[in-house]
């Protein structure tokens, strides 16, 4: 509200600003402020947009970008920005150079599209007083705090996190954007002048700040950093970027989602930075390549094509015979869904009996999911006429309404052809040495990056299998289809041409019942893997599950890795999971943990699973039957009862005594517990919560408390043998680090809370105790590696150690091709100085 006398109290402890407008002169459409002097007092800038930006996604940002462009790096720190229907206002001070540049442009700013908006300036609207709000002070305070709170990301620590810097709550009364060169310079000066913290810095996260010019970073140059993250900014000029980073060095530079990466001569236009950065967006310079998408350079979604929405659905038949590209535009303002989850929901509405639907060139643009399709008019008509252009989210019964742009582009020679991509991908999936077609996570293949191939569609799955059948009809003996969200496989007849096919792996899919894969029963399969599908939960007992599968596949000899001829009626232990993504967690964590708990030599290694904030409790309600062995059983149970937190049997004032905190204390308690052996066949697992960041795991089953041994003159003597106990363990685990390991796909978990309970086993559990032999993994004889696997091990070992090929082969062969043993052998030899310098490449 310009010219209205008032007092601005920001409530942050600063002295209020009293707007009294002593000078009534308002400058507009002029190039000079005459005999007035801006001085150090507060000035008011008014932007007269007259509502022209009302329907723009972020009018304030559009105006600020135009102002930053006009002042061209001069000091400019707006305060108290106010949006209005016809005009926006802000206060500034100590910015004479910026005001001069605005007058030089006759108090007009140019928007990105070429339009101009007039502004007016009133000088000295309020007198500056000491301790009033000072933008530079607030900025320095936030930067200083962040420098003391450096973060770790992707295994790199010491990173200063300035992502979306202007969103910090301390700036609620300021306009802070690193897209303003003067503010970026101010931030760099604060960092440069902080000698106490500056030398701890290992990199900078400057993403999502609308930065165009990074010249201020020259202040921080001539130091070797690990990371410079500039993603999601407005960097467009390669020449300006290279000049600004001429002396800046870091292991990796991140430029994703900047205009510069969409320029036709990228990355050649930044080649001068090759000696400054090892990686750009995760790739070495020599592996960078232009990822083409017509959505980037050929299609303007605002003007190209004809819009179809719920208001003009009747126009759709006009495009029935069109061979052009059509764009789907699905609004998602908060980017709630990533690409994979979005398509999971979108595909629900497709009609499986109609044309194959291949979304191409998917991108999230502004606030919308966008992709292109062609040659599937019947599916489009179904989505328009039957689904009313609505995408339903089953959880919460939410609806996302969308629209189409038909005929946005003609088909050009260099555009993607989905079926050609599928044929190429299938060819690359065949492993000749093992005669196996590995279609696991088929949609993630590199040659399918521009097309979404969903094997949850029965027709698309049938097409993929028909391609495979024609290509490998006499050679393929096994097909892996795991992790593909397969719902139905009703076209397995196309595999009839594969005369050698004997094994199919359908694990970790979405198959609901055996009728969905009934067509596989016509093939002479000997091995089938189904675990990880919802159909496995349809059976209470393993024997029921095996019997049902054998009715459809009578010739099977192996089911889920279990030999049905040796162990008829038995299958792997059951898992009850709230999310099928937890299968990997259960397999990797639970078995390893219990194996290490069993082994006296390795139990101390459980230290790695706990942190200083971990909590452990133990309870025991084993009821002892009175007989001649009672004293000895009570003696054995005393090791559990000593640490048990049985509140019903103890004084409530000592309730906290049975709660153990911290990894050291917890492992000390675990080491005092007896040696045990778990009956892995008895285990029942329930993952009650899993979200990728943590999980709640409950496991129950049978264990054998092994007897302690005593020595006498006649050899070894034991007391009463092993005691069978029922047990349950509940783990609350969190993932504290991700993207670990050589493949950057490993995660490190920590147990936040654990409860161990000891009780009486059921009569059924005792009767079936240890009836199935689960050998220790360390005792299993490894199968001979194929030549292809050995070659991969040699290459990986060379990459890890840096040895020349002759030494690599020597050490790996000495370790009998066991990669873990080979690494330990290398470390030992290197420590003993047995490897000469000439052995390293």
Swiss-Prot record:
NTF2 domain boundaries: 585-758
A Gene Ontology term for the protein's cellular component: cytoplasm
Recorded phenotype for the gene knockout or disruption: Results in sterility where fewer eggs are laid and none reach larval stage. Increases transposon expression. RNAi-mediated knockdown in the germline does not affect ovary morphology but results in severe fertility defects where eggs are laied but do not hatch. RNAi-mediated knockdown in the germline increases transposon expression and impairs Panx localization in nurse cells by reducing its stability.
Known outcome of mutating residue 210 to A: Abolishes RNA-binding
Domain RRM: 325-408
InterPro entries the record matches: Leu-rich_rpt, LRR_dom_sf, NTF2-like_dom_sf, NTF2_dom, Nuclear_transport_factor_2_euk, NXF_fam, TAP_C_dom, UBA-like_sf
Tissue: Expressed in female gonads (at protein level). Expressed ubiquitously.
GO biological process, one term: transposable element silencing by piRNA-mediated heterochromatin formation
Alphabetized UniProt keyword annotations: Cytoplasm, Leucine-rich repeat, mRNA transport, Nucleus, Repeat, RNA-binding, Transport
Region of interest: RNA-binding unit probably involved in Piwi-dependent recruitment and single-stranded RNA-PPNP complex formation: 1-285
LRR repeats, residue ranges: 200-221, 224-245, 249-270, 475-496, 500-521, 524-545
Main location: cytoplasm
Biological role stated in the UniProt entry: May be involved in the export of mRNA from the nucleus to the cytoplasm. In the ovaries, forms a complex with nxf2, piwi and Nxt1 which acts as effectors of cotranscriptional transposon silencing. On recruitment to a target transcript, interacts with single stranded RNA, thereby anchoring the complex via the nascent target transcript to chromatin and allowing Panx to recruit silencing effectors to establishing repressive heterochromatin at transposon loci. Does not affect piRNA biogenesis. The interaction with Panx stabilizes the nuclear protein complex.
Assembly notes: In the ovaries, part of a complex composed of at least Panx, nxf2, piwi and Nxt1. The complex is knowns as Panx-induced cotranscriptional silencing (PICTS) complex, Panx-nxf2-dependent TAP/p15 silencing (Pandas complex), SFiNX (silencing factor interacting nuclear export variant) or piwi-Panx-nxf2-p15 (PPNP) complex. Interacts (via TAP-C domain) with Panx (via NIR region); the interaction is direct. Interacts (via NTF2 domain) with Nxt1; the interaction is direct and prevents Nxt1 binding to nucleoporins. Interacts with sbr/Nxf1.
Domain notes: The RNA-binding domain is a non-canonical RNP-type domain. The TAP-C domain (also known as UBA domain) mediates the interaction with Panx.
UniProt-listed PANTHER family: NUCLEAR RNA EXPORT FACTOR, NUCLEAR RNA EXPORT FACTOR 1
Annotated protein name in UniProt: Nuclear RNA export factor 2
Naturally occurring in which organism (per UniProt): Drosophila melanogaster
């Amino acid at each position: 509200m310009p010219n209205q006398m008032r007092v601005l109290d920001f409530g942050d402890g600063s002295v209020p600003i009293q707007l009294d407008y002593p000078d009534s002169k308002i400058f507009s459409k002029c190039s000079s402020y005459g005999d007035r002097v801006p001085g150090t007092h507060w000035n008011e800038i008014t932007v007269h947009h007259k509502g022209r930006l009302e329907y723009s996604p972020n009018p304030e940002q559009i105006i600020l970008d135009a102002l930053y462009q006009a002042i061209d790096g001069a000091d400019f720190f707006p305060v108290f920005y106010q949006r209005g229907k016809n005009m926006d206002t802000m206060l500034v001070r100590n910015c004479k150079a910026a005001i001069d540049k605005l007058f030089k442009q006759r108090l007009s700013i140019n928007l990105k599209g070429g339009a101009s908006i007039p502004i007016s300036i009133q000088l000295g609207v309020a007198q500056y007083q000491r301790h009033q709000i000072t933008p530079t002070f607030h900025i320095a305070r936030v930067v200083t705090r962040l420098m003391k709170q450096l973060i770790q990301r992707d295994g790199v620590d010491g990173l200063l996190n300035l992502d979306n810097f202007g969103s910090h709550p301390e700036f609620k009364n300021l306009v802070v954007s690193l897209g303003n060169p003067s503010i970026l310079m101010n931030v760099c000066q604060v960092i440069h002048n902080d000698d106490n913290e500056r030398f701890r810095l290992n990199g900078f996260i400057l993403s999502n700040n609308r930065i165009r010019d990074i010249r201020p970073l020259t202040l921080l140059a001539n130091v070797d950093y690990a990371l410079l993250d500039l993603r999601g900014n407005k960097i467009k000029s390669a020449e300006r970027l290279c000049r600004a980073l001429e002396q800046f060095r870091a292991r990796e530079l991140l430029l994703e989602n900047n205009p510069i990466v969409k320029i036709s001569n990228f990355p050649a236009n930044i080649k001068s930075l090759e000696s400054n950065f090892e990686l750009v967006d995760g790739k070495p310079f020599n592996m960078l390549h232009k990822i083409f998408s017509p959505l980037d350079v050929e299609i303007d979604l605002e003007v190209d094509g004809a819009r179809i929405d719920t208001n003009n659905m009747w126009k759709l038949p006009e495009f029935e015979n069109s061979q052009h590209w059509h764009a789907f535009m699905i609004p998602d303002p908060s980017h709630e869904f990533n690409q994979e989850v979005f398509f999971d929901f979108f595909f629900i509405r497709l009609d499986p009996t109609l044309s194959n639907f291949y979304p191409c060139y998917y991108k999230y643009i502004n606030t919308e999911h966008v992709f292109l399709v062609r040659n599937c008019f019947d599916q489009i008509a179904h989505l328009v006429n039957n689904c009313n252009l609505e995408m339903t989210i089953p959880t919460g019964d939410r609806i996302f309404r969308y629209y189409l742009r038909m005929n946005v582009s003609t088909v050009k020679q260099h555009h993607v052809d989905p079926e050609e991509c599928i044929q190429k991908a299938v060819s690359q999936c065949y492993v000749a040495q093992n005669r196996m077609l590995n279609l696991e996570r088929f949609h993630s293949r590199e040659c399918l990056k521009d097309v979404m191939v969903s094997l949850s569609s029965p027709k698309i799955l049938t097409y993929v299998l028909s391609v495979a059948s024609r290509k490998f009809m006499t050679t393929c003996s096994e097909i892996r289809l795991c992790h593909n969200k397969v719902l139905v496989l009703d076209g397995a007849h196309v595999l009839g041409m594969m005369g050698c096919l004997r094994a199919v792996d359908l694990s970790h899919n979405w198959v609901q019942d055996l009728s969905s894969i009934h067509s596989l029963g016509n093939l002479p399969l000997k091995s089938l893997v189904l675990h990880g599908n919802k159909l496995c939960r349809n059976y209470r007992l393993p024997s029921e599950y095996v019997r049902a599968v054998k009715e459809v596949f009578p010739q099977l000899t192996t089911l889920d890795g279990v030999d049905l001829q040796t162990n008829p009626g038995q299958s792997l232990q059951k898992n009850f999971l709230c999310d099928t993504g937890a299968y990997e967690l259960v397999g990797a964590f639970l078995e390893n943990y219990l194996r290490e708990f069993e082994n006296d030599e390795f139990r101390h290694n459980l230290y790695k699973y706990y942190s200083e904030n971990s909590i452990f409790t133990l309870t025991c309600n084993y009821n002892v039957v009175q007989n001649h062995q009672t004293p000895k059983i009570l003696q054995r149970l005393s090791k559990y009862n000593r640490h048990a937190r049985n509140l019903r049997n103890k004084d409530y004032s000592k309730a906290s005594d049975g709660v153990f905190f911290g990894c050291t204390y917890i492992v000390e308690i675990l080491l005092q517990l007896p040696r045990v052996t778990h009956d892995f066949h008895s285990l029942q697992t329930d993952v009650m919560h899993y979200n990728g960041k943590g999980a709640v795991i409950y496991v129950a089953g049978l264990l054998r408390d092994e007897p302690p041994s005593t020595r006498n003159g006649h050899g070894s003597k034991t007391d009463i043998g092993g005691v069978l106990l029922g047990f349950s363990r509940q783990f609350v685990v969190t993932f504290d680090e991700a993207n670990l390991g050589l493949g950057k796909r490993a995660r490190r978990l920590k147990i936040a809370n654990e409860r161990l309970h000891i009780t009486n086993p059921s009569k059924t559990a005792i009767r079936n105790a240890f009836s199935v032999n689960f050998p220790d993994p360390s005792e299993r004889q490894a199968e001979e590696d194929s030549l292809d696997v050995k070659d991969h091990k040699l290459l990986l070992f060379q990459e890890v150690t840096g040895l020349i090929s002759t030494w690599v082969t020597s050490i790996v062969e000495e370790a009998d091709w066991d990669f873990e043993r080979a690494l330990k052998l290398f470390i030992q030899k290197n420590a003993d100085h047995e490897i000469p310098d000439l052995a390293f490449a």
